Swiss-Prot record:
Region (Precursor leader): 371-385
Pfam family, one: TP_methylase
Notes concerning its domains: Within the homodimer, the clasp domain wraps around the adjacent subunit to position the core peptide into the other subunit's active site for iterative intermolecular methylation.
Protein name: Methyltransferase/ribosomally synthesized type I borosin cyclic peptide precursor sveMA
Active-site residue numbers: R73, Y77, Y99
UniProt entry tagged with the keyword Membrane: no
This enzyme's EC code(s): 2.1.1.-
Chain intervals for the UniProt region annotation (Clasp domain): 251-375
Region span, Methyltransferase domain: 1-250
Biological process (GO), any one: methylation
Amino acid sequence: MASSTHPKRGSLTIAGTGIATLAHMTLETVSHIKEADKVYYIVTDPVTQAFIEENAKGPTFDLSVYYDADKYRYTSYVQMAEVMLNAVREGCNVLGLFYGHPGIFVSPSHRALAIAREEGYEARMLPGVSAEDYMFADLGLDPALPGCVCYEATNFLIRNKPLNPATHNILWQVGAVGITAMDFENSKFSLLVDRLERDLGPNHKVVHYVGAVLPQSATIMETYTIAELRKPEVIKRISTTSSTFYIPPRDSEAIDYDMVARLGIPPEKYRKIPSYPPNQWAGPNYTSTPAYGPEEKAAVSQLANHVVPNSYKTLHASPAMKKVMIDLATDRSLYKKYEANRDAFVDAVKGLTELEKVALKMGTDGSVYKVMSATQADIELGKEPSIEELEEGRGRLLLVVITAAVVV
């Protein structure tokens, strides 16, 4: 069915609850829990389940009832999606909650969203903290340096996906290799070990990772050689879909100096991407840089004489503007009222400056950025952006913050 240009009554929002109990749940997701007509969920701990059930304004439904030990998981996924869709078709504003990020290794969420959009309903996904995010934090990894390759373990095997020995490699669901139902006995795990040994050798290190869920839980970070993965006592510890393998780089990649020249990077300014802190699990051919080399020491020595640039913009807004923007960001129902009639909403807010009112009535992020920040010089002079400058901000304002890149 072709998508409708006018969404029907009823909507579907899919959100993630994160991995660690409640700690990873976003304010946006909490707002949706409190406002949805019906909430469907799959979570991995009773505390998150209790929070959902106690904060939802409407009925809640545990989608895990559609799992069964001998039941094909894809059948369960289709049923989970259809149950949510049926509620949307009834005209309900439906929230589907999935642990972790709702779009990463989650089939029913994508299926339900696609069908809802195809049938003309409003549908969107809200992000959540994934197991990958959790692992990057716990292991101290940056996927940008030296790059990252991720595969689901079974798909990695059946499609003969390549590992990259010069990047981070992540294998998901290593505790359920070849499993299509809910019986995670992992009898095919040896096939995964065979493949890893073939590609990287028996002595390369692998980190078995499982992020902590409950406050009383402990994160698992166990390091083994690939050969040690064959030990029965190790195999017993890798037996659920929560188990993830981090496979560190073995080698350092060569630099394409021809491309460096084509990119126009001056040779005298170019140096290798810094690799600090060193990767404690990497192979012997993977190089790293010291914490305080010549360039780092020079950067530190400049701190004593650092002067804030004239172009730096600091937060500068009325208390009313700060409050209304925080409220709009954390209260979905309030934002809907704002969008329904911006002029009336803004006029009812006390304490806004006239320019802040104009920006809020425009309803664009660019205009809001412009009235909520200013250089120190403009603040001292009492200079504000003009209406014309706010109009120029009607388009989406792109903010780019580079924290990891080739150093030039």
